[in-house]
Amino acid sequence: MSVNRILVINPGSTSTKIGVFDNERPVLEETIRHDEEQIGKYKRIIDQYEFRKETILEVLHSHGINISKLNAVCGRGGLLRPIEGGTYTVNDAMLEDLKNGFSGHHASNLGGILAYEIASGLNIPAFIVDPVVVDEMEPIARISGIAGMERKSIFHALNQKAVARKVAEELNHKYEDLNLLVTHMGGGITVGAHKKGKVIDVNNGLNGEGPFSPERAGTVPVGQLVEMCFSGEYYRDEMIKKLVGQGGLVSLIGTNDAIKVEQMVEKGDPEATLIYKAMAYQVAKEIGGASAVLHGKIDAIVLTGGLAYSKILVDEIKERVDWIADVIVHPGEDELQALAEGALRVLREEEAPKEYIVREKETVARG
């Protein structure tokens, strides 16, 4: 089998994770930590791309990586327009939306730009894979009870789809032939109904749907939320933080560290026990609801993400949902590996690269 060498780039707010893979095998994985004062000099996140590019190239050189031997560069997908899942070739339309922050400004927008900047000089393809804006929801799933307020698809697409493919392989099937309920449990929690390779429904794990998580509130009583918003006690930004960042375990028990909460549970703390069980309860309830989306025809329930390492949490969830289907646990996430595998599927011609297309009617982002 021929070897495809792939450079993978995953930018964060103050760091850039890079990996070099020979097919599925990691040759190099490194987290480059950027000096906050240095990156603070740039007015916009997007202006950091040249600085980050040079830093990446220096690190590769220091490890003896000859970039002329690369077959492709793959970056983390950013805040683009809603697109279906898959591996996309970075093109001019995508670069424009990433640079302009069409759907928002985030460090992940640098992924496609950095991939393109490095790849174009080597005359090799640049890709992104399954960004958070992956949207494969069916029309019926978009309807909410307020006109003009559509439900949105924002979830852990990269890890959910990567793990779903692994599970399909373990079951000796193609991802596109199975119905799976995939639950990513990390700082946020998302439950996706995967129908024959498409995530036809999923809770918006970013800002206000589904189970509460270590730092997100999830679905809350709407009437009480409205009263809180108009109480005069909070600014808008404070309310957003209550939903994202200071919600969930942070609000209820004062920490987003699930390990600390587990230690409290093991010591018999009644409040910690109730709250941790409540999080598992809400995850199980979301899985149960998603099973109805697939008419109960489920090949497997998959638990993944950092919290899937928690035996207490996993056992609580299993106890409530294992009557629906077998529960398969794949703890953690490996974004670099997932990106490399997405690029590799295209290089091996197992799937065709997708094209990012901007349609005339899409003058504003869904957001």
UniProtKB/Swiss-Prot annotation:
Gene3D superfamilies: 3.30.420.40. It catalyses: butanoate + ATP = butanoyl phosphate + ADP. Its EC number is 2.7.2.7. One of its GO terms (biological process) is acetate metabolic process. SUPFAM superfamilies: Actin-like ATPase domain. InterPro entries: Aliphatic_acid_kin_short-chain, Aliphatic_acid_kinase_CS, ATPase_NBD, Butyrate_kin. The keyword Transit peptide does not apply. Transmembrane segments: none annotated. Coiled coil: none annotated. Its main location: cytoplasm. Keywords: ATP-binding, Cytoplasm, Kinase, Nucleotide-binding, Transferase. One of its GO terms (cellular component) is cytoplasm. Pfam families: Acetate_kinase. GO terms for molecular function: acetate kinase activity; ATP binding; butyrate kinase activity. It is an enzyme of class 2 (transferase). It is found in: Cytoplasm. It comes from the Bacteria. CDD domains: ASKHA_NBD_BK. HAMAP family: Butyrate_kinase. PANTHER family: ACETATE KINASE (PTHR21060), BUTYRATE KINASE 2-RELATED (PTHR21060:SF3). Belongs to the acetokinase family. This is Probable butyrate kinase. It comes from Bacillus cereus (strain ZK / E33L).
